[in-house]
Amino acid sequence: HLTDILRSYVEPAQRNGPPLYQSLIDAGLATLWSAVRGFAIGGVFGFALAIVFAHSSLMTRGLLPYVVASQTVPILAIAPMIVIWMSRAGAIDWAVPVIAAYLTFFPVTIYTLRGLTSVPTTALELMESYAASRREILFKLRLPNALPQIFTALKISATASVVGAIIGELPSGIQNGMGIAILNFSRYYNQSPPRVWATIFAAGLIGMLFF
């Protein structure tokens, strides 16, 4: 029942421990920090990739199919491999943000590319007739035209980064985060279902706030 879920927030998460809401705040902040870093990495990478594709049809034909194919592989299958690679590279602290970035870069790439390449033909021909450089066309025509698409992509990617961070926490071995909290409470679901649902609702709230 909803009342049981709400009551569980003020009950101790563990015996003689702090209230559940306090534990979830700590876990939520850890997840949010990973999501923010992943959002930044994925956003910058996706934006740069879209600019490259917008200026090179060869790169678009050669790489875009692989970008699309990368999103057909379940993130749950890729996350453990990323954790292993980052651990071997001595950057295990960045494993979760990288997993979050993996889900973030794709919407940014696709939406930004669509905005950059959907400029009015007459406007593009006019700038070319004035011998405008590629850089001038990019900053004065393509980017302003793509802004609505970019903002849409960022809103989608914001929630995707939270999902990626939560999933990335599961195989990473970290001690704090919403993913770990959900996993730990799920082990005792039969004993205390409200705690699991309270944690899931808190994770959803983080995604809504980041959106």
What kind of feature is each model-predicted range?
Residues 1-11, 172-187:
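Short hydrophobic, aromatic-rich alpha-helical segments embedded in or entering the lipid bilayer
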Residues 37-67:
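Transmembrane-helix boundary motif in ABC transporter permease subunits
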Residues 1-40, 193:
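Periplasmic/extracellular loop-to-transmembrane helix junction in inner-membrane transport proteins
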Residues 98-102, 135-168, 198, 202:
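Transmembrane alpha-helices
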